[in-house]
From Swiss-Prot:
Similarity field: Belongs to the COG2 family.
Pfam families in the cross-refs: COG2_C, COG2_N
The organism's taxonomic lineage, starting at the top: Eukaryota, Viridiplantae, Streptophyta, Embryophyta, Tracheophyta
This protein's record includes keyword tRNA-binding: no
Subunit structure: Homodimer. Component of the conserved oligomeric Golgi complex which is composed of eight different subunits and is required for normal Golgi morphology and localization. Binds to COG3 and COG4. Interacts with FPP3/VETH1 and FPP2/VETH2; this interaction promotes the association between cortical microtubules and EXO70A1. Binds to SEC15B, and, possibly, with EXO70A1, SEC3A and SEC10A.
Organism: Arabidopsis thaliana (Mouse-ear cress)
Protein name (Swiss-Prot/TrEMBL): Conserved oligomeric Golgi complex subunit 2
GO cellular component term, pick one: cytoplasmic vesicle
Amino acid sequence: MSDLVATSPSPSSAPRSATDFFSDPYDSHPLWFKPSLFLSPNFDSESYISELRTFVPFDTLRSELRSHLASLNRELVDLINRDYADFVNLSTKLVDIDAAVVRMRAPLLELREKITGFRGSVEAALFALRNGLQQRSDAAAAREVLELLLDTFHVVSKVEKLIKVLPSTPSDWQNEDANSMGRSSMNDENSTQQDGTTMRETQSMLLERIASEMNRLKFYMAHAQNLPFIENMEKRIQSASVLLDASLGHCFIDGLNNSDTSVLYNCLRAYAAIDNTNAAEEIFRTTIVAPFIQKIITHETTTNAAGTSEDELENDYKQIKHFIAKDCKMLLEISSTDKSGLHVFDFLANSILKEVLWAIQKVKPGAFSPGRPTEFLKNYKASLDFLAYLEGYCPSRSAVTKFRAEAICVEFMKQWNVGVYFSLRFQEIAGALDSALTSPSLVFIQDSDKESSLNLILRQSDTLLECLRSCWKEDVLVFSAADKFLRLTLQLLSRYSFWVSSALNNRKSNASPSPGCEWAVSATAEDFVYVIHDVNCLVSEVCGDYLGHISQYLSSSSTEVLDVVRISIEQGGVSLEKVLPLLTKTIIDVIVDKSVEDLRQLRGITATFRMTNKPLPVRHSPYVVGLLRPVKAFLEGDKARNYLTQKTKEELLHGSVSEITRRYYELAADVVSVARKTQSSLQKLRQNAQRRGGAASGVSDQNVSETDKMCMQLFLDIQEYGRNVSALGLKPADIPEYCSFWQCVAPADRQNSISV
C-alpha cells in the first residue's frame, strides 16, 4: 500500500500530456457505452454483453471495458491517497473492537448509576433549601408588615400626642375659638411682644414636625393598604389630618398678618411636607389677596369725563402691582428662596392671578370683549404687562415656564380672543380700502391734506397708505397676531394692484366696466400720470421707511423671521411695480389714438394722384406736422414734467413714437400695395388693348406712374416725419418700423441711406 502511495502521484500534481489537450479525455466514452448501468440493481453482465455484441465488435467492447477499469483504478488510488492518514489510524483502532466495547460498558453503567443517585440527592437538597428560603422570605415579609404596622401605630400615637400639645401652647391664648379664622382681631399689644413672636414660631415648628410625621404616616399607609389594622386606624388618621390642617391654617394666617418670616417658612415647609400646597395658596388668596382685589375692581356702570369705559384695567393693574410689592413680596421671596424646597408653591398664579381673573370676570366682563377693539387692545396690552410684572418675581427661566404653563394662566390668556379682534380690525381696515377703491372715478386729495399724504395725489392711494400704516400702529397691532397683520398688509397691496390692473385690462377689452373699474374708462392720460406718480411713491415708501418700521417693531424676533418679513414686503412692492408697465402702455395707447386721427388724411393721396396729370410732389403733406403733436404736448405738459420720472418719460416717448410709426407704416404700405396692384391691372389692360388695336397707345411708357408719384409723396412725408422724430430726441434709424417704411417708399437710389 505504501508503494502504491509513493508511486502514484496526486492528480493535482501529475503533469498533463499532449493527449490530454489534443485528444479525447480518459473518461470519454462512446454513446453506446453507459457506465451508469453498472450501478443498476438489476444489472446482468451476460445479457449486457450479448446485447452489445449485436452491433459492437468484441475487441472494441473489451478495449472499452478495460479503459473503464483503468479509470476506476485511478479513482480508487486517488481516494486512498486523499484519506490515507485517517484510513491508517482507523485500521489500528479496529483491532479487537468488540472486546473493548464489552470492557468499557460495565464501568460506564456503574458511573451512570452513581451520577443518577447524586443527582437525586442534589435535587432533594435544593428542594429543601428552597423551602427554607421561602419560609425565611415569608417570615421577613411578615416581620416587615408587623414593623410597618407598629411604626404606623407609633406615628399615629405620636401625631395625636403632638396635636394634643398644640392647644396648650402659649400661642393659642390669642384665640379662644380653634375653628375661627379671625386672626385679624388679635390683641396688637400682645402680638408685638417678643414672647408672643417666639410662641408663634414655636407653634409653627411644632406644626412642621407634625407635618413631617404625617408625611411618614402617608408613606406607611401607601405600603400597607387593605390591611384590617390600617382600616381600623383610618378614622384616627383622618381626624389628626383635619386637626393638623386647621391648626396649620391658623398659624399660617397668623404669620401672614404679622409678617413673621420664620413662621411662614415653617408653615410652608409643613404644607410642602404633607403635599397640600393648594391649601396654602387658597388661604393666601382668600385672606390677603381677595379683600384688596375686591376693593380695587368694583362695579362701575358710568363712564368718566373723557368718555372712556370703566372696563379699562390699566389703573386697576397699577394698584395691584403696588399691592403686590407692598404686601405680597415677602411671601413670594420666601417661596422662591434658593434650595428651600418651597418652589412647589405658585402664589403668583394660583393666588394673585386667580383672584384677579375671577374679579374681572365677575365685575368687568366687558374688558374681555373684542367688540370694542380699542378698549380691548388697551386692556389686553395692560394684561400682558401685568403678566410680565408677575413673571419678574420668578427666580429663573424654568420658573417662568412653569408659571406660563399653570392652568389659571392658560385660562387667563384664553379670555382674550385675539382672533375675533383681528377679524374686526380686518373688516375695519380692508373695508376702508375697499370703499375707497369702489369709487367710480378718481378722487383727488385736497391741498390741505397733502402734507400728511406723502405727496400722494389720489384719495385711493392715500387710503391704501393709511391702511398699511394702521396695520402696524401701536394702538392696532397685537404682537401675537403679527403674522396675520403681515398677511393683511400683503393683501392690501395686492388689492390695490388688482384695482389698477383690472381697470386697465377692462378699458383695453372695451367690456362693460365692473364695479371699481369705471374710473379707467373715462380717465385721461393725465389721470394715469397721477396713478403712476402715486404707485412710485407707494413703492418707495413700502420698501423704505415702512419696511424699516416693521423691522424695528419685530426686532425681538429671530433673523429668519425678519428675513421672511423683509422678503414678503419687498414682494408686495414688486406687485405694485408690475402695474407700471400697464399704466405706461395705457398712456401710450391714449396718445397714439389722438395722433393717428390725422392719418385718415393719408387715404387722400390716392385720390390726389389717381387719373390725374399732376407732377411729382416736391413737399410733404400738411397732416404730417400734426402726427407727433399729441406726444410733444403731453411730454411738455405740467403733469408729465412734475410727476413723471425721466425714465418713464423716455419710455412713453419711445413707445408712443414706435406705435405711431408702426400704424403709419401699416397704413402707407396698404396704400402703396393697392396702388401697385391697380397699376399692374391697368397696364395689363393697356397691353391687351394694344394687341387688339394693332396701334401704339397714346400714353407713353416713359411717363412717371401714379404709384411712383404716391411713393414720392409718402417719401417726402416720411422725411418730414423723421425730422419731427429727431426734434423729440430720437433717432429715426433706431426705430425698426421707420426703417421698413423708408425702404417701402424711398427711391431705389436712397433705399440704403436714411437721412432726414
